[in-house]
From Swiss-Prot:
Subunit-structure text: Homohexamer.
Keyword set includes Plastid: no
Pfam families from the UniProt entry: AAA (PF00004), AAA_lid_3 (PF17862), FtsH_ext (PF06480), Peptidase_M41 (PF01434)
Cellular localisation: Cell membrane
Organism of this sequence: Alkalihalophilus pseudofirmus (strain ATCC BAA-2126 / JCM 17055 / OF4)
Residues holding Zn(2+): 428, 432, 504
GO (cellular component) term, any one: plasma membrane
Entry membrane topology: Multi-pass membrane protein
Protein name: ATP-dependent zinc metalloprotease FtsH
Cytoplasmic side: 1-6, 136-679
Keywords, ordered alphabetically: ATP-binding, Cell membrane, Hydrolase, Membrane, Metal-binding, Metalloprotease, Nucleotide-binding, Protease, Transmembrane, Transmembrane helix, Zinc
Residues annotated as the enzyme's active site: 429
An annotated GO BP: proteolysis
Amino acid sequence: MNRIFRNTIFYLLIFLVIVGIVSVFNSDQTETENVSFNEFAERLENGQVQELSVKPERQVYLVRGQFNDQAEDEFFQTYALRSEQTAELLFNAEDPTGTPFNLEIEPADETSGWVQFFTGIIPFIIIFILFFFLLSQAQGGGSRVMNFGKSKAKMVNEDKKKAKFKDVAGADEEKQELVEVVEFLKDPRKFSAIGARIPKGVLLVGPPGTGKTLLARAVAGEAGVPFFSISGSDFVEMFVGVGASRVRDLFENAKKNAPCIIFIDEIDAVGRQRGAGLGGGHDEREQTLNQLLVEMDGFSANEGIIIIAATNRADILDPALLRPGRFDRQIQVNRPDVNGREEVLKVHARNKPLNDDVNLKTIATRTPGFSGADLENLLNEAALVAARHDHTKISMIHIEEAIDRVIAGPAKKSRVISPKEKKIVAWHEAGHTVVGVKLENADMVHKVTIVPRGMAGGYAVMLPKEDRYFMTQPELLDKIIGLLGGRVAEEVTFGEVSTGAHNDFQRATGIARKMVTEYGMSEKLGPMQFISGSGGQVFLGRDIQNEQNYSDAIAHEIDLEVQRIIKECYARCKQILLENKDSLDLVAKTLLDMETLDAEQIKSLVHEGKLPDDHHLNAHLEKEKASESDVKVNINSKKEETPQVEAEQPQEPNTDEPIEKDPSVEDNRSFEDDTNKKE
C-alpha cells in the first residue's frame, strides 16, 4: 500500500509539472512596455491610442492598451492614481477617429496577499518535491536518498534456511568446527561452565568451489538465531564515508538481535592489507576496514555476535583482521580427498536416478583434485548427456563422457584434420602413454585419445595412483620425463618435431625451476630457496614485487641447473622410447584406428602387444557411441543416423616426408590436459 501511495504521488507531481510547463508556453507572450502616465496622457491627446482597458486596484488604476504610431503596434501599460481627474480623462477618452472608447473595465482583484504569496512559491515547492522523488528512485537496491549509509545485510528468514549440516559432505573436520559455534548459541552454559569463550570470529579459507558459502548457509539453517548475510563488496560505494557507516549500522542491527551470526562473503574485498602497494592508499576502503576492526574487537564489546567470513585470498588480508580476538579461528576448507569426493557425490546424486552400473567410489577415484562445485557440475553434465539420448537413468557411460567434457570440453569429431597431423597427434600421445606406463614413479595412464575436445587436438589423462599432498624428487623427475614423451616420440619417429609440445615444455620447465629455486633439490646449489621478485602475483594492498635474494651469478647457476634437469630427463625419455619402439608404434597405430584407449587397453597393448578380449572392446565402442552426441543432437526427438567416421588405416610413418611447421598446429592441439596436475 505504501508503494502504491508513493507511485501515485510521484505521477501526480509529474502531471502538475507538465501542466505548469504547458501553461507557461501557452500564455500570452506579447511584449508589453511600461510607460509613464504623462506619456500616456500625451499620446492619448494626440490620438495615438487605439485600444484601452482599465482595471481598478486598491489605490490606482491599471491602464492597458495599444499605440498605433509604430511600424508594429506596441502594447503598453501604466498606473494612475484613483482620482476624479484621472477618471474623467480615462472615461472621456476618444480614439483617433474621434469615437469614444468602448472602455473595458476589468473587475478589481480582491485576492489577499497571503494567497498571492503562496501562489508564487507553490511551483518551487513542487519542483523540490519532484527532485526529492527522482533522487529516491535513482538509489539502487531499494535504498533511498537519506539512508544510503544503512547496511545492506539481509536477515535470512526461517523459511529460507534450507541448507543443513547433512547437506555438507567431504568436510567433516571443518563442519565440526562450526557445529561448536552453533552449540554455543543454543546452549552457552555448557561452555561457560568450564570457562570457555566461543570464538568471536571464524574465517573460512580455501580454493573456489570447496563449499565455504555452503558451510555458512548450513550454519544459518542450524543455528536457530538471526543470521545476517552480506558481501564484502556491499560496503564501499561511490559516497565517501558510506562504508564505515554501513559497518556501524550492521553491528547496531546485530546488537538488537543478539545473539546472532554475521556472515561476510568475500571479505577480501574490504579487508585487504593496508599499505603503499598498488591501490594500498585507498582511504575509503581503509576507513571501512578500520571501522570493522573496531566493531569486531574495540573499546566496546559486542557480546553475542559471532562473525563468519569466507575468502579464497587469505594471504592478502590485513594482519590486524586475523589476530585472536577478531578471527580467533581459521578453518582451511580444502578440496576433498577420495572419501570426501564419494560423500559429495552421494549428496549431489540424491535427486538423480542412477543406473546399477554407476559406482560412486570409482568416480571419486577418477576425479582427483575436483572440488565440490566441480563434482556437482560433473553429475549435472552426466544428466544432460543422458537426457540428450532420451535415457531415464544416468549410467556410467554418461558419467565417463561428462568427465571428459569437464576436463577437456565437448568432443569435436566433425573437425577436419589432415592425415599428416592426425599421425603426428597419434605418435605424440602414444609417447606420453608408453613413457607413463614404463616409469615406476609416474602417474597412472588412465586414458588417451586423439579425438579433438575443446582447444585440444588430443590428450592423455594421467591420474595419481592415490591422493597425495607432496611429491618426492623421483616423482617430480618422472613427471618431467612423462611430459617430454610426446616431443621425443615425434623426434624418434619422424626425425622432426612440431609445435604441439608447447604446453608440455612450459609445465616441465616450471617443475624443474621450482625444484631448484623452491624445493632445494639441486645438488650444486644445495637446500636453499631463491625468491624472485617477478614470481609473485600482483594484487592490491601489497607491494608489487619482492626483493630478489640472490645475485646475478646465482641466477646464472639456476638457469644452468634447470637446463641440466631438462636435458637429463629428455635423454632418459629418449632411451625409454627407443627401447620400447615397438610398443610406441603399436599404441599409435591403434589410436589411429580406434581414436580412444582406456587404461586396460593401454596396459594390454604395452605389456602383451594386443588388445584385450571383445567384451572390453565392445564396452569401449559403446562409450564412443555415447560421445557421438557432441556431433549431432536430436532436436526434433527423432532418431538420426549416427555419422560414420572413417578411421585412417594404420600405416608405417614415412620418416622421409618432411613435417610442415604450421603455426596453427599449436593453437589446435594441446596434447596433455592440465588436470593431470591435480594432486
